[in-house]
Amino acid sequence: MPRRIDVRKVLMLGSGAIKIAEAAEFDYSGSQALKALREEGIETVLVNPNVATIQTSYKLADHVYLGPLQPWFVEKVIERERPDAILLGFGGQTALSLGVELHRRGILSRYGIRVLGTPIEGIEKALSRGKFRETMMKAGLPVPPSTPATSVEEALRAANEIGYPVIVRVSFNLGGGGSLVAWSREELERWLVRAFAFSGTGEVLVEKYLHYWKEIEYEVVRDQYGNMVAVACLENADPMGVHTGESVVIAPCQTLTDQEYQLLREASLRVAEAIGLVGEGNVQLALNPRDSWEYYVIETNPRMSRSSALASKATGYPLAYIAAKLALGYRLDELLNRVTERTCACFEPSLDYVVVKVPRWDLEKFEGVEKSIGSEMKSIGEVMAIGRNFAEALQKAIRMLDIGEPGVVAGPRYEEPESLEEVLGKLRRREPYWPIWAAKAFRLGASVEQVYEATGVDPYFLSQIREIVEVAEKLRRTKPWSSEFLDLLAEAKRLGFSDEQVALLTGTTVEKVEKARRSIGLDRPRVRQIDTLAAEWPAATNYLYMSYNAYEDDEPITTGRPRLIVLGAGVFRIGVSVEFDWGVVSFADEARRLGYEVVIVNYNPETVSTDWDISDKLYFEELTLERVIDIYWFEKPVGVIAFLGGQIANNLAKPLEERGVRLLGTPGRSVDRAENRAWFSQLLEELGIKQPSWTAASSIEEVLKFAESVGYPVLVRPSYVLSGSAMKIAWSPEELKSYIEQAARVSPRYPVVVSKFLEDAVEAEIDAVGDSRRTVGTVIEHVEPGGVHSGDSTMVIPWFSLPETAVREMIRIAETLNEVLEIKGPFNIQFLVKDGSVYVVELNLRASRSMPFTSKVTGYNLMRAAAEAALRGRISYGFNGADGFKLLRPTGWWGVKSPQPSWQRLRGAYPGLGPEMRSTGEVAALGRTLHEALLKSWLSVQGNRIPPAGSIVLIYTPTGRGSSDLSQAAKLMTEKGYTVYTIEGMEVDGAEPLPLEQALRLVRMGGVGLLMTTDYAPQRDYRVRRLAVDLGVPVVLDARLARMLAEAINRVGLENLEALELREYWGPNVEPF
């Protein structure tokens, strides 16, 4: 059937900011869907406040609205744009829940908007726990014993009837938000209130906990005529009770018999049929490891999901693209497989390789957080590795995590002295990165059975890890360079060992291991092509990986143009997110426009850059020195771009250059001078540029003497780190000693710098691109003071309180550094401004986290300028002849970027701001005034809302700092009709004080609509902040932001927030990008 012709304009809802459980996989799936719609000539309207994504650009969408994903704002967009239809399946749970709410309020019917894909009724059947259970039972599909509950009392009764242990699941949620496993009534009662706070419908499901059952997922595609295929089977190595987002996941399934595979596949197809799926859905099932015929259907997601993104990249089957086409009315057999360009979309992929996904956590950044993993997602990102066997793929995946481990064995966690009982304790508690702890347990003499009892991981996977350990320990015992050693080395390479691992195990150097490897004919791994059908049909794309388990290269397709390699950002973690992927994809576009063949190296399954049609060649590979050099010598490019991939790529710049790799852009020696804190501080002194007083930490005694001379507080900063890792403000000698030790552990090879911390300074920065003579950029002012990491700050363009003299000095410094360091690409300088003086804090000679925001607010694509600077040596874009600094300063509009925290997801963590970054994503909005842009941006952060008039607002200061701003906020909120309270001992003027216990009771009873506070003082107010975030109360954590927000609520209000398209602010003379 041809597609429906009554759809000419489609509204698509994005997923908003990157947050735990809802990350860049939706940027990828949404981008694919927009691409599919554009191919069909359909006009698209996108609502998504995530300024950092490729999706919110005119490359894909016809109309882009940065604004809150809330019904009132989306209705304003609908009123202006009048779309024919809406797509809900490509923006995660945020888009689905919002779509259901638009339907319930009658907004969709009022404007005659049709829902494409799975109908609302099907969405509700899938996402309401009670309705899903009924639907499955009606379809004759088994579900675990369970009871829906709408109150704490009902849930406790249900658990008594079912019997402990139980798992509590929340309706209309994702990432296991609010879910829990309870082994007793006391444990259940303790966390139920929090579970209900996560539920959008006030409903939870109390279900029998299936201890150590296997968790299997199928990705199902179905058209509206009932044709369907199971595109992928994903096996969770972790058992039931560990959220799939927290689990090690393998494709294809490794431990199922054919009987089990077909049984569960058939069940998955019946689930899709039962809910009326149209497009793509994920079905999760539990299989009893002791009885092949006993299984249960656990849940389904009638939308693109994290697993869908993984399945797409693992199989080469473009699930989101196909799902969007099916939503338009196509049949499966009418659509082509875009990898082979010969077979149709109704062919189920077949894999001749193994894919392993491993999550990445950043729990050490959060004080008080619960460290074990379970039914609720806490991981920030994930990696995907491809190998010819499980061991090879797993070793690659561990390296890709960028946690300082060279693989499953030989790293610091594996080598640190511990007893077997200590290691088994970590496995029982489910501490992150269990494959390393399992390997260590085997090294200490544990049996497969012992590790299985501690983890519930199938013995097959455990035996593969034990094999890695056996080879590692043999290497350790064998005389280097003997014939036995060389045989072992060949075996180790086939099991995914890196040269660094072998060197660590044998006490030799990487160079010697490499020489030995070459002597036995292993010059490099072979290049393999992903074709989706196990080589039955030739592939028409360059989707590649490398393996030592192959004897010849697949021949990639070449264009004949000069070739360059672009290094991606790797795994997402706090500080590295989709902003860097925006840079990679935007730069790749510009490089191709300038006539280059672009080869991207990256391994993040969530990203647009790892989509095989973004570049001329994609290597889904490690970003390690060994692998990048392998690719470099095979591809023979004109050079490598390392300034777009965040800290991973930046840290590779110098070692790559030392190995003869040609870096394009800013020279490696300049990068080294900027990243090494001590060297950079010396450079600033030579240039006469002010900086806070500093010293390099050569000994604790010297540092303490320095701190005494300049006075506390002081700032401790390691080198070559991102997101402020181990960056701390020390207020006493005891704190300083502790922080120096932490910083030395994070960056052991480089100096730790200690500098005077300037209290109450304004923080500002310049985002720019330079070519050594020309500089183009903008000045950004932070709302929060210096001392709050830039990634956690509210950013404003143009500046709003900086003196013009300070801005001129910042521009002068940028021009000087551009010339002196021979910059040829993007850079970012961070400043502190105090009493009119400008101090440089740091310089990053790479694309910054804020560059998508800068570009989209100003209407100037910094990546286009970066491509010209790096590849042509000269920026022409936007220049009319003269050199110097081109200042990008919007007139008539403002842009505000707000951080997206994930406090609620991180049970136990203290919500507070400081020099180490803790937010997981960002949003932005534009407005005609600063207050309009600020309010719109703040409301775009998930969980933020303006409480109804008459609600209670709690405002206090735990340290006494910020009391003036908070008092003004209290006065303004009172004027607006709110009841404002403060806390005794932490009072602010203009609010009625309450004893701490009474304030806690008020929060617990749901009486507080907004909390405003400041500073980082867990010993003073941990309970108030933690309870507020657990119960979903919006929290403002800085005094100046609280005051400005109160002004915005007073002056603007929801009714006056405009819904304008991005380019309406830019004006007609800006070329959309």
Curated annotation (Swiss-Prot):
- What InterPro entries does the record tag this protein with? ATP-grasp, ATP_grasp_subdomain_1, CarbamoylP_synth_lsu, CarbamoylP_synth_lsu_oligo, CarbamoylP_synth_lsu_oligo_sf, CbamoylP_synth_lsu-like_ATP-bd, CbamoylP_synth_lsu_CPSase_dom, MGS-like_dom
Alphabetized SUPFAM superfamilies for the sequence: Carbamoyl phosphate synthetase, large subunit connection domain, Glutathione synthetase ATP-binding domain-like, PreATP-grasp domain
- Binding positions (ATP 2): R717, K756, L758, E763, G787, V788, H789, S790, Q830, E842
> Record-annotated residues binding Mn(2+) 2?
E299, N301
Extract one GO cellular component term from the record.
cytoplasm
Residues where Mn(2+) 4 binds: E842, N844
Cofactor remark from the record: Binds 4 Mg(2+) or Mn(2+) ions per subunit.
Q: Which residues bind Mn(2+) 3?
A: Q830, E842
What are the start and end residues of every segment in region (Carboxyphosphate synthetic domain)? 1-402
Ranges for domain ATP-grasp come to: 133-328, 681-871
Q: Where is this region: Oligomerization domain?
A: 403-555
Q: Supply the enzyme class, top level.
A: ligase
> Which terms are listed as keywords in the entry?
Amino-acid biosynthesis, Arginine biosynthesis, ATP-binding, Ligase, Magnesium, Manganese, Metal-binding, Nucleotide-binding, Pyrimidine biosynthesis, Repeat
Which Gene Ontology BP annotations are present?
Answer: 'de novo' UMP biosynthetic process; glutamine metabolic process; L-arginine biosynthetic process
Which PROSITE patterns is this protein grouped with?
ATP_GRASP, CPSASE_1, MGS
Domain named MGS-like is located at 944-1073
Q: Where along the chain is Mn(2+) 1 bound?
A: Q284, E299
Its subunit composition reads: Composed of two chains; the small (or glutamine) chain promotes the hydrolysis of glutamine to ammonia, which is used by the large (or ammonia) chain to synthesize carbamoyl phosphate. Tetramer of heterodimers (alpha,beta)4.
State the protein's name.
Carbamoyl phosphate synthase large chain
Kindly list the organism's lineage. Archaea, Thermoproteota, Thermoprotei, Desulfurococcales, Pyrodictiaceae
Q: Which gene encodes it?
A: carB
